[in-house]
């Protein structure tokens, strides 16, 4: 039996195809561009159902309405092989279900693959990706535990588990799993990412800066998502300490412009620009530079978490396509899963209102969406953007009571957070509490307090 580098059965003995399968799996797990070579490998070997199935899966990950259309070519080719290879057959079923938007079936089949082949970390990663997009964090943990049980010697499995623990708020377990991944492979980027989440959540800002600055050399050569996203996390740490110019430098050099056509690069840029503005920092013409790429998303309703950020970016750039995208989301919500109409639409309405300066409308709509934000996917750190927008709307309408409550709760996680304390100065002065305003100012280094 022919096996891949993890010990899973494959349907070819062709050396080039075998290498291509290994490059796809290893590159996918490690966020390396070599994974993209599976397209050429599949084109060169139409008799490998597995190679063509993997090529189709890769195209589904572009997170674009074009994905299923592009993937169908490889699905048809894989099906034409009439393979009897058990693993290839299940992957073909996975691809078919995903193209048909039958996500429950994709999840069932991918976990079935992991049960059949305990070292199939590709199946584990695919399952976690889809559950992540639906906010099912306990499912991530279940899959992560299976992955480490089947492949305890592979660093990527512990990275998968670490992030799952973190999203379940099991921070000590998350840190331990991330450190185990790094013991096995110091360059494991998903473990870097999981530890960044832990440190941010626990307010270990200086430690987070030191850690990420110490491992950033490992991100060179990774695919654009992992490269830009880990830099995005480093930018959040610097933003929390008021290092505004450093954040802008990171944005310009490491967050935007690596692969501007890609969905994750776009929402990372939108999110960081929005956070900069919410912190009172002028971002110049950066929204305008981002806008041409977002304008291509006017009909994009692939993932709610992505669509609402495209919309916010378009609105901040002053583009009419923001209204067109909102109309597309309304149309999609009629027949889509309930989360689109019940959470995504009010979130989109609220973000659009905020971007255009209607803070009261923003508060009204965001108040509907925020309690159920978990259902649209995105990590805790990513979804926090929407809470920050809602907080900014409170400040703009003069809801000092609500803002004070929110800000002091946020300060429990990081007492020295500069944007939080800047806002508290304004709030306490408005509330007639100059002593508290003085203390907030002191926390950002403005003055000393006796």
Describe these PLM feature segments.
Residues 13-18, 23-39, 43-47, 52-88, ...:
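Inter-helical turn/loop elements of alpha-helical hairpins
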Residues 26-27, 58, 92, 96-97, ...:
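Residue-level signature for tetratricopeptide repeat
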Residues 28-31, 62, 100-101, 134, ...:
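Structural motif corresponding to the intra-repeat A-B loop/turn of tetratricopeptide repeats
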Residues 40-41, 77-78, 112-113, 146-147, ...:
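Canonical positions in the second alpha-helix
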């Amino acid at each position: 039996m022919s096996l891949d580098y993890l010990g899973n059965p494959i349907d070819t003995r062709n050396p080039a195809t075998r290498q291509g399968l290994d490059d796809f799996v290893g590159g996918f797990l490690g966020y390396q561009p070599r994974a993209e070579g599976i397209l050429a490998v599949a084109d060169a070997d139409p008799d490998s159902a597995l190679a063509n199935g993997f090529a189709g899966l890769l195209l589904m990950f572009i997170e674009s309405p074009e994905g299923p259309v592009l993937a169908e070519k490889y699905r048809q080719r894989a099906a034409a092989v009439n393979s009897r290879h058990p693993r290839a057959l299940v992957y073909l079923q996975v691809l078919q279900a995903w193209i048909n938007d039958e996500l429950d079936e994709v999840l069932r089949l991918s976990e079935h693959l992991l049960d059949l082949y305990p070292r199939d970390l590709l199946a584990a990663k695919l399952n976690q990706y889809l559950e992540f997009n639906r906010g099912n964090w306990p499912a991530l943990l279940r899959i992560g535990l299976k992955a480490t049980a089947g492949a305890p010697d592979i660093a990527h499995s512990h990275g998968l588990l670490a992030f799952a623990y973190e999203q379940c708020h099991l921070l000590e377990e998350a840190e331990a799993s991330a450190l185990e991944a790094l013991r096995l492979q110091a360059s494991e980027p998903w473990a870097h990412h999981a530890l960044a989440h832990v440190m941010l959540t626990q307010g270990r800002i200086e430690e987070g800066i030191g850690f990420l600055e110490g491992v950033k050399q490992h991100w060179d050569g990774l695919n654009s998502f992992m490269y830009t996203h880990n830099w995005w996390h480093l930018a959040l740490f610097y933003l929390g300490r008021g290092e505004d110019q450093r954040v802008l430098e990171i944005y310009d050099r490491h967050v935007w412009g690596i692969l501007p056509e890609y969905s994750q690069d776009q929402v990372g840029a939108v999110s960081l620009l929005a956070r900069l503005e919410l912190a009172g920092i002028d971002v110049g013409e950066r929204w305008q530079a981002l806008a041409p790429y977002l304008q291509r998303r006017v009909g994009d309703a692939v993932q709610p978490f992505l669509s609402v950020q495209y919309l916010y970016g378009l609105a901040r750039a002053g583009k009419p396509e923001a209204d067109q995208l909102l109309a597309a989301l309304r149309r999609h919500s009629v027949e889509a899963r309930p989360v689109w109409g019940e959470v995504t639409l009010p979130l989109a309405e609220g973000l659009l209102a905020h971007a255009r300066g209607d803070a009261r409308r923003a508060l009204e709509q965001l108040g509907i969406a925020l309690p159920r934000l978990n259902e649209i996917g995105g990590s805790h750190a990513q979804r926090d953007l929407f809470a920050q927008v809602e907080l900014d709307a409170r400040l703009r309408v003069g809801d000092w009571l609500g803002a004070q409550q929110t800000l002091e709760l946020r300060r429990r996680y990081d007492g020295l957070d500069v944007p939080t304390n800047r806002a508290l100065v304004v709030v306490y002065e408005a509330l007639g509490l100059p002593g508290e305003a003085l203390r907030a100012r002191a926390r950002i280094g403005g003055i000393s307090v006796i």
